[in-house]
From Swiss-Prot:
InterPro entries: Dynamin, Dynamin_GTPase, Dynamin_GTPase_CS, Dynamin_N, Dynamin_stalk, G_DYNAMIN_dom, GED, GED_dom. This is Interferon-induced GTP-binding protein MxA. Residues 246-249 are annotated as: G5 motif. Induction: By interferons. Residues 145-148 are annotated as: G3 motif. Residues 69-71 are annotated as: G2 motif. It comes from the Eukaryota. Belongs to the TRAFAC class dynamin-like GTPase superfamily. Dynamin/Fzo/YdjA family. The gene is mxa. CDD domains: DLP_1. One of its GO terms (biological process) is response to bacterium. Residues 214-217 are annotated as: G4 motif. Residues 546-637 form the GED domain.
Length: 646
């Protein structure tokens, strides 16, 4: 393999390598579990020459054979060192990490890791294997090799193996942070390759896709010009363009041609080729040029992604912190500390309960609001009263006639029958009792639901404590609902006593009369003058009496409905919020008296401890990941380009 100049390498050590190392370190910390990291994913159909390209880049033999050879995503991390005699390998997967110093062991180590991850055979796994190679003969580069796309399942493979592989590939190529390195043989129709089609589906403009043409020595005579056109980006356009390489073929492998010898052969092939020599001269050919191109692209992509990556880490940290706050700290083991912890839990719940029922912010969660729903229910109650008033007005004329016939006794015509007035008022008020009780039931259910939600977010991970809180909420709900129902029924019994202050009633009556006069003035006058309320024209003087009765009924209903519009919600709020919250607080405080029962109430859900541990691990990963990003953000991409052009 051609070696990069020492100056180039020195600049890597100072600037480029830290950039790539930062992303590699984030990946090793497990940050990729939380968000996507900049990467180069290598994809290709089976037998596309993908493994040969990676072998040539890394300088070590990788697993080969027919069918699916790459059965797990393989992170190939190459670190260039100044020490010409040093070669070191490290393979990591699951909880295993192994160092070795013989490059010949790479293939065996990868196969062992794949067997452990995906099982012996030909299955695949989505778990990542990481292979780190430190050598003077490799570029500073990190690639992720993905399984080759299979068209037909072979013996021992599930029928949907092709779909499994494509699903795995899509996990990587859909990410905006991924550069798609698509490997395509020169001797096939590039437009029909599934690897390029998948990349185009997720990256239609080709901004994240780089094409690699392999096996130029197998091109049919007469088609070389098409290959040149593809590399020149004149057939299927990719923003990042194309490169062309020639790696060891199967015969050369069997003849034990070394990778260094293969690189020399590749260089000679392109220099002397009648059609491809200009690609060599233009810098589009050979593995060393590909390594340089990939390094430039990766560093560019990393630098471009850094601001967004920093923002994502900050967002994820905030989300993690919020989740940790929701789960809270686990209970301490020391008895006195456990009691203090329990007291704090109950006190915080009681304070949040008070805040919830008075419309203040709840500390344990930001989206638990009670009063907006109560306001809606009470608005519905007010609407019921308005509709009842409208229907009352419509039936007044008919009902007054009926009451006059049925109840008017010795009074002379023209006198208002107070008994008729009271009867009509009472009948209308009775119709409102059932809707009021329904409003009570609805609000009671809303309050119960909110109280339970508060308990759930206050006692996350403590099932026994949550259970007893729910039991108390249910009991108090039934009790206070029953008391509120009794108060409402009493209220409606009192409403059957027709009463209002003289001043209040007189004002309401005057308002009703003024409104009626305005309506009559606006009504078109008939050519033949008729009484103002023709429906009351009974051929007697009773129409004046009935007109007065109608005004009195409307006036009183207005007063009664306003009274009920406020009184019913006040009774409900008093019993279901204020009294229920106070009783629940007292009940919860009584738990503190049973010190022997504290341990049982603080038994934590087995899953919660694990979730808290996972969140703490994520928080640690993300915090550690932010430290090197700050420095890299200070270095602009122009700095990197200047280095690479030296």
């Amino acid at each position: 393999m051609e070696k990069l100049s020492y100056t180039f390498s020195q600049q890597y050590e100072e600037k480029i390598r830290p950039c790539i190392d930062t992303i590699d370190n984030l990946r090793s910390l497990g940050v990729e579990k939380d968000l996507a990291l900049p990467a180069i994913a290598v994809i290709g159909d089976q037998s596309s020459g993908k493994s040969s390209v990676l072998e040539a880049l890394s300088g070590v033999p990788l697993p080969r054979g027919s069918g699916i050879v790459t059965r797990c995503p393989l992170e190939l991390k190459m670190i260039r060192t100044k020490d010409q005699d040093r070669w070191h390998g490290r393979i990591s997967y699951k909880t295993c990490e192994e160092d070795f110093d013989d490059p010949a062991e790479v293939e065996k180590k990868i196969r062992q890791a794949q067997d452990e991850m995906a099982g012996a055979g030909v299955g695949i796994s989505e778990e990542l294997i990481s292979l780190q190679i430190t050598s003077a003969d490799v570029p500073d580069l990190t690639l992720i090799d993905l399984p080759g796309i299979a068209r037909v399942a072979v013996k021992g493979q599930p029928e949907n193996i092709g779909d499994q592989i494509k699903r795995l590939i899509r996990k990587f190529v859909t990410r905006q942070e991924t550069i798609n390195l698509v490997v395509v043989p020169c001797n096939v129709d590039i437009a029909t390759t599934e690897a390029l089609q998948m990349a185009q589906a997720e990256d239609p403009d080709g901004e994240r896709t780089l094409g690699i043409l392999t096996k130029p020595d197998l091109v049919d005579k007469g088609t070389e010009g098409t290959v040149v056109d593809i590399v020149h980006n004149e057939v299927i356009h990719l923003t990042k363009g194309y490169m062309i390489v020639r790696c060891r073929g199967q015969k050369e492998i069997m003849d034990q041609v070394t990778l260094n010898e293969a690189t020399e052969t590749e260089s000679a092939f392109f220099k002397d080729h009648p059609h491809f020599s200009k690609l060599y001269e233009e810098g589009f050919a050979t593995i060393p040029k590909l390594a340089e191109k990939l390094t430039i692209e990766l560093v560019h992509h990393i630098q471009k992604s850094l601001p967004r990556l920093e923002e994502q880490i900050e967002t994820k940290l905030a989300e993690t912190q919020k989740e940790l706050e929701a789960y809270g700290n686990g209970p301490p083991s020391e008895p006195a500390a456990r009691l203090s912890f329990f007291i704090d839990k109950v006190t915080a719940f009681n304070q949040d309960m008070l805040n919830l029922t008075t419309g203040e912010d709840v500390k344990c969660t930001t989206d638990l609001l009670l009063f907006p729903e109560l306001r809606q229910e009470f608005a519905k109650w007010s609407h019921i009263l308005d509709r009842s008033g409208d229907s009352f007005n419509k039936k007044i004329e008919k009902e007054v006639d009926n009451y006059e016939v049925k109840y008017r006794g010795r009074e002379l015509p023209g006198f208002i029958n107070y008994k008729t007035f009271e009867g009509l008022v009472r009948d209308q008020i009775k119709l409102l009792e059932e809707p009021a009780l329904k409003t009570l039931k609805t609000v009671s259910d809303v309050v119960r639901k909110k109280f339970i939600q508060l308990a759930q977010c206050s006692f996350i991970g403590f099932p026994n404590l949550l259970k007893i809180a729910k039991t108390k909420i249910e009991g108090i709900k039934l009790n206070k609902e029953s008391l509120a129902e009794s108060m409402l029924k009493t209220q409606f019994k009192m409403e059957l006593i027709v009463y209002s202050q003289d001043g209040t009633y007189s004002q309401s009556l005057k308002h009703a009369k003024d409104k009626l006069e305005e309506m009559e003035k606006e009504r078109p006058q008939p050519k033949i003058k008729l009484p103002l309320l023709s429906s009351f024209d009974l051929g007697t003087d009773n129409h004046a009496t009935l007109r007065e009765m109608r005004l009195h009924l409307k006036s009183y209903y207005t007063i009664a409905s306003k009274r009920l519009a406020d009184q019913i919600p006040m009774v409900i709020r008093y019993m279901l919020l204020q009294e229920a919250a106070l009783e629940l607080q007292r009940n919860m405080l009584q738990l503190l008296q049973d010190k022997d029962g504290v341990d049982n109430l603080l038994k934590e859900d087995c899953d919660i401890g694990q979730k808290r541990e996972n969140l703490l691990s994520r928080q640690t990963r993300l915090i550690e990941g932010t430290q090197p990003l700050g420095h890299l953000l200070e270095v602009t991409f122009i700095d990197y380009c200047n280095i690479l052009m030296q």
